[in-house]
Amino acid sequence: MPSFDIVSKVEMQEVDNAVNQAIKEIGQRYDFKGSKSEITQEKDAIKVLADDDYKLKAVIDVLQSKLHKRNISIKSLQYGKVEPASGGMVRQIISVQQGISKEKGKEIIAVIKESKLKVQAQIQDDQVRVTGKNRDDLQDTIQLLKGKDLDIEMQFTNFRE
């Protein structure tokens, strides 16, 4: 029975490279001269520190552009709330989402069932497995999910006959 997996994985090495490029650009840009803005990465989180909300937005914009250039979807980032830090600065923690949460998995399964395609979907840890009798139904399912905006970056892997 043909099947495929829906996963949401981010290449952390690419995130690390994008963060390093953003740090380098912030150090060189004229509008950040004299600013204490910085970006640090800890496992699956990126911490952004800036002088004020305007600088914070500019730093995040630089980071997003570097991530986009490295083919990392902005959908895989979850932004924490902006909080005050010491010295009158502001901080925001951005977490990099790995895997599909149970809630998103249920949402994906609901979309698939709603479409009335002859496939079955089930949640397996942090991925969703879709099985069907023929390959065309699976390909239609992939196209359906690509067309929907589920606020999550999805990759379709492990396509088997």
Swiss-Prot record:
Q: What's the source species for this entry? A: Trichlorobacter lovleyi (strain ATCC BAA-1151 / DSM 17278 / SZ) (Geobacter lovleyi)
On whether Nucleotide-binding is a keyword of this UniProt record, the answer is yes
Record-linked InterPro entries: DUF520, UPF0234-like_C, UPF0234_N, YajQ-like_sf
Job of this protein: Nucleotide-binding protein.
A single GO CC term for this protein reads: cytosol
A GO molecular function term, named singly, is: nucleotide binding
Q: What is this protein called?
A: Nucleotide-binding protein Glov_3198
- Listed Pfam families: DUF520
Q: Which UniProt keywords apply?
A: Nucleotide-binding
- Annotated signal sequence is none
By its UniProt entry, which HAMAP family does this protein fall under? Answer: YajQ
Q: Which family does the record claim for this protein?
A: Belongs to the YajQ family.
